[in-house]
């Protein structure tokens, strides 16, 4: 296993996750801001590790495996925490939609890789926009300094859910022939 700066950034993101959860539950007034800040630092490493791996030609198989796992674990845990905090359908429904999509697409990618057609379900631009909307919405819903930030966060969460469904349809459409053939 080769460790380089992009891989270390990904590992750092994984290490931040338990601290993020712990800070979220601290019974102090600054915990929402601190949890959102930790989440944002982790989210930035998600972008930065991939950028550096491509820029410095330091892509590794381990990094290619760990990066999406770290991203999905971070986002899923953030969604669970936000859902638990708000106790409302307007947060739970988009979160459940996005988590279900991640499970479906992960299974689809694995299955397509077994068929030797992994590239036909590669990450699309809509997936990148979805991830950005998710990260911003989650950061605002974690921070929640005032009601307007929460409203914008919830609206962005719904935008992310719609983009999630759209990107899932793109992936399923790209794999349609193989899905129907088997």
Swiss-Prot record:
What function is annotated for this protein? Catalyzes the conversion of cytidine diphosphate diacylglycerol (CDP-DG) and glycerol 3-phosphate into phosphatidylglycerol. Essential for the synthesis of anionic phospholipids, thereby playing a role in balancing the ratio of zwitterionic and anionic phospholipids, which is thought to be important for normal membrane function.
Q: Which keywords fit this entry according to its UniProt record? A: Cell inner membrane, Cell membrane, Lipid biosynthesis, Lipid metabolism, Membrane, Phospholipid biosynthesis, Phospholipid metabolism, Transferase, Transmembrane, Transmembrane helix
Keyword Lyase appears in the UniProt entry: no
Residues in compartment: Periplasmic: 38-60, 108-145
Check the record and name the InterPro entries matching this protein.
Answer: CDP-alcohol_PTase-I, CDP-OH_P_trans, CDP-OH_PTrfase_TM_dom, CDP_ALCOHOL_P_TRANSF_CS, PGP_synthase_bac, Phosphatidylglycerol_P_synth
Q: Which residues lie on this side of the membrane: Cytoplasmic?
A: 2-12, 82-86, 169-181
Please classify the protein's predominant subcellular localization into one broad category: membrane
| Sequence intervals crossing the membrane | 13-37, 61-81, 87-107, 146-168
What the entry lists under Pfam families is as follows: CDP-OH_P_transf
Locations listed in the record: Cell inner membrane
One of the entry's Gene Ontology molecular-function terms is: CDP-diacylglycerol-glycerol-3-phosphate 3-phosphatidyltransferase activity
**One Gene Ontology cellular component:** plasma membrane
The annotated pathway is: Phospholipid metabolism; phosphatidylglycerol biosynthesis; phosphatidylglycerol from CDP-diacylglycerol: step 1/2
- Protein name in UniProt: CDP-diacylglycerol--glycerol-3-phosphate 3-phosphatidyltransferase
| Catalytic class of the enzyme | transferase
- GO BP of this protein: phosphatidylglycerol biosynthetic process
Record's catalysed reaction(s):
a CDP-1,2-diacyl-sn-glycerol + sn-glycerol 3-phosphate = a 1,2-diacyl-sn-glycero-3-phospho-(1'-sn-glycero-3'-phosphate) + CMP + H(+)
User: What is this entry's stated membrane topology?
Assistant: Multi-pass membrane protein
Family membership noted in the UniProt record: Belongs to the CDP-alcohol phosphatidyltransferase class-I family.
Q: Give EC number(s), comma-separated.
A: 2.7.8.5
**Domain of life the protein comes from:** Bacteria
Classification of source organism:
Bacteria, Pseudomonadati, Pseudomonadota, Gammaproteobacteria, Enterobacterales
């Amino acid at each position: 296993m080769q460790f380089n700066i992009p891989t270390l950034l990904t590992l750092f993101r994984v290490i931040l996750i338990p601290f993020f959860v712990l800070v979220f539950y601290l019974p102090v007034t600054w915990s929402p801001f601190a949890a959102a800040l930790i989440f944002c630092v982790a989210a930035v490493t998600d972008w930065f590790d991939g950028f550096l791996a491509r820029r410095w030609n330091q892509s590794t198989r381990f990094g290619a495996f760990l990066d999406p796992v770290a991203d999905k674990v971070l986002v899923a845990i953030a969604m669970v925490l936000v859902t638990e905090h708000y106790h409302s359908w307007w947060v739970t429904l988009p979160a459940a939609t996005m988590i279900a999509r991640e499970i479906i697409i992960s299974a689809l990618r694995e299955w397509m890789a077994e068929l030797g057609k992994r590239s036909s379900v590669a990450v699309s631009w809509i997936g990148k926009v979805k991830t950005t909307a998710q990260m911003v919405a989650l950061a605002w819903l974690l921070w929640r300094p005032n009601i307007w930030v929460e409203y914008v966060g919830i609206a962005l969460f719904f935008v992310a859910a719609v983009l999630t469904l759209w990107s899932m349809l793109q992936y399923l459409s790209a794999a349609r022939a193989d899905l129907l053939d088997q």
